[in-house]
Amino acid sequence: MRYEAIVIVTPEVPSIRDADRVVGILLSKGIKNIKLIINRIRPNMVKTDDMMSIEDVKNILGIDLLGVVPDSEKIIVASNRGEPIVLEAKSCLPGKAFENISRRLNGENVEFLDLNRPGGRNSVKRILKNLINRST
């Protein structure tokens, strides 16, 4: 039987340190197909060097990236209401990020959202408009 694992981290030192230990344990058990999800990233904090970047986290852990979920108040609100954030995929970046992760898990080749580019939200709107136009 072939096992796979997904390691979910936040870009904070304690989380990365714990994830590094988990990756080591998984590898020692023969689990080599390990994917990474970086949760609650804040691009503005990365720009000011107050948070590790996506590349920093990938380099430290040395595993393939499955997805990145930006931090958002919408996640907190949806969680408190018991609503899945993916229902907001068309109107919020975290919802789109979760949708993209699930599509990658299903084997689709999906580009990563550009969270570092100014106007990143506009690029998501552009992508969604293109998807809608293709399906009609």
Language model features: what each stretch is:
Residues M1-G67, D71, I76-V77:
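Conserved catalytic-core segment of NTP-binding enzymes
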Residues R81-K96:
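C-terminal boundary of histidine-terminating zinc-finger modules
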Residues N100-R104, L113-T136:
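A short, charged, Gly/Pro-tolerant segment at domain boundaries
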Residues M51, N59, C92-E99:
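Short, well-ordered alpha-helical segments
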Residues E55, E73, K96-E99, R103:
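A generic structural signal for well-ordered alpha-helical surface patches
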Residues I34, K90, L113-N116:
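Residue-level detector of alpha-helical recognition elements and their boundaries
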